[in-house]
Amino acid sequence: MDLIQQQIAHEEALVGAAQNDARIALEKAIAQGSIDRIPRARIMLMRMLPIVTEAIFAHQEAKAAGPAAKLRHLLRIIDAQDLAVMALRAGLSMLINYPTITATKYYTHMGKMLCREIEVRLAFKVNQPYYDRTLDYLKTSRTRSVRHIQKTMDALLDAVLPEEARIDLPDGDYLRLGKFIGDPLIQCGLFEPNRFTGRGGTSVHLEPSPEAREFLQDPSAAMTWGGPGRSVMLAPPRPWNDWCDGGYYSAKAQKHHVLVRRTKHQTKRARQAQLRHLGQDKMPKVYEAVNVLQSVAYEINRDVYEIIERVFNSGGGVLGIPQRTYPDKPEFPLGDEWAKENASEQELEAFNRWKRSVHRWYTGEREHTAKLREFAALYRVVREHHGKAVYFPMHVDSRGRMYYWGTPNPQGSDIAKACLRFHDKRVLGKRGLYWLKVHVANSLGCDKVYFDDRAAWVDERWDDFQRALAEGPENYPGLFPEAESPLCAIAGLLELRAAYASGNPEGYRSGFIVHMDATCSGLQHYSAILRDEIGGAYVNLLPPGLAKADIYSRVLGLVNESLERDRAPGAEGEARGYALLWDKAGLSRSLTKKPCMTLVYGTTFKGVVDHCLDYLDESGVEIPEGVPSYRLGSYMATLILDAIRETVPSAVFAMEWLQRLAKALPDASKDLHWITPLGMQVFQSYPKTEEVRVRLRAEAVEYVTLYEAKDELDPMRNANGIAPNFVHGLDSSHLGLTALACAAEDIPIQAIHDSMGTYASDVDRMHVHIREQFIAMYSGPCVLVELAKQLGVEATPPRRGSLNLEAVRDSWAFFC
């Protein structure tokens, strides 16, 4: 069997695993009682069934009024125990397919499922012979495809039921109906609700309860998760010839893995318009770049994997390797009888602090679950494909941002990156050894000084590193801080040790990948566009000397100056009190790093406030009674954002200019369409949404909000979205152009958005191309002016400074 035949068989097996082993095995175990196949599911079902049945029966018998009362007659059509089994089967299926699911999607699915069951039962009464023939067909075909069964039943309903007998409800009513059978699954402990607040507002997500998480961590369950995107390719991906023709080989895999994904921030109209512009003839360089990037062969670094496996099997929790179990959620500090409306200010502060800690816990728990899934996939790949060349097909989002499919993913966690290296090997040479050392230093946080100093830093600690490798890196937490990338550092040290052990380190053949990262790439783009010498210096567009410019420290310095002014003895007002409180926290650059990094990608003022309050909590600072936490956070957020504005004024100006440009469109209902420097056809059209609010009594949440997207543009969201989407397109363009330039010299690139990696021996040439392509992108007409022309808006060109772009060529810290 050749590689392509192996890959097709591999894809078909993975698709089968995803559709059958994960979903049908669980549903069949519930329906048939196959306890030998999934014993934990059997235990959960048998324990929960009486509780769910009783709760649904209570809903059926209730007389309460309200928006959902008109739907209760539908609930009463089916026996409570039948509904309970149906709901539990669906709920357990969701556990397999989704690590988290929005409450709106969950309830709406339950409501539609209930209505479908009612319709099929009615069809049975209307025409039992037709139903029996349909059932015989399904049995004869021995289908295990849920989708196939659904399509067959659709045909039955179309043939048997008249249109007036079909159930057709608004989404809001499906949601309300679904609550009747969905809430009992939360009450019995299958799911837990979690409330998230983001830029789009507040939403409720349902996640597996601790018992369900334990079920998911069972290796027999984890190893059944599949689909081509959950593994690797064994043959080079098919070159993309069209947006739906490339990547995977089998028809099923191709259908669900197209080149350009639709985003939820697009109207249907915008998506259809974009599809008409996604041909290879309209954006040839995009196709060329993704084909180059996905043609690179990788392999698993078995030595690194064995360290990860050993640490995980001993309990995990060090070197960034997940614990086998996740810590319990923070306990509610105020007692069961506490009521928010009767709370004191001190109690409200304790409540808000607890909410922030729970939010951090859920974030950590999701990351923990993701790492467990990543480790399970890594285990499978090592077991089945160790020593083989493996590949990762590429795709892009609607802005042109490039991603790999597959697990372990080159853009994944420290675990994934450390375990991947190029399959083909190249001689290290003197410079390759040098860059390996720089990589180790970068991975351990020694990344502010010049490259020579980083390499020397590793040499000075070589004996300590050798001892740690011999005795187990997990026993040396001081050498490998988890805040950095300890596993990538260990991978580099293992490669160095192997090179030295060969007796000819410069002649050692290596597939190790060394990455170079941008310094706040979004700010680099805007500073270059407007030729901003001030901002450009702080993001290393200009040569910085022997230590790279640190914008986070610069912003922190300005914040400290403001604090010193506000806390001076003669200062008055609440600002002085806030400044004194923040002084107690002991400010560090971690406070300003995240806002600097996320400003150009659409962070909100509230997001910065929440970040500041999290920093206070983690610093152990108690907010005194009577001090409103949000105002305290707002005070610091304002100082940080003002400091960023002073440090990189061009970036803030460019973002505001872009927003004004979007608002100046002559037709506010028109999609925004522009072309990135790489040639990506971007169609931005944020849809208006209609909001339906439903109370969730079982979760103790006041409302869950259902958003129904309309095929109508929201001008305000469109204006707010243009700046982050525009800079994402610039990031991906720089990456794609650099990958093409490197490919011309046979230098493969591993792409991580604003970070690029290659062979240690080729890092010097990669540095050259990174800089040359950046200079070339901005040496022509101003991209902001070109954007205005593409949008058909007459706009005053923004003022530009005197930054000489050629200086980027000599800035060692531009990517470092």
From Swiss-Prot:
Gene this protein is translated from: gp26
Record keyword Cytoplasm present: no
Annotated source species: Pseudomonas phage phiKMV
Enzyme Commission number, as recorded: 2.7.7.6
A GO CC annotation given for this chain: DNA-directed RNA polymerase complex
Reactions catalysed, as given in the entry: RNA(n) + a ribonucleoside 5'-triphosphate = RNA(n+1) + diphosphate
Biological role stated in the UniProt entry: DNA-dependent RNA polymerase that catalyzes the transcription of viral genes.
Class in the EC hierarchy, top level: transferase
Protein's name in the database: DNA-directed RNA polymerase
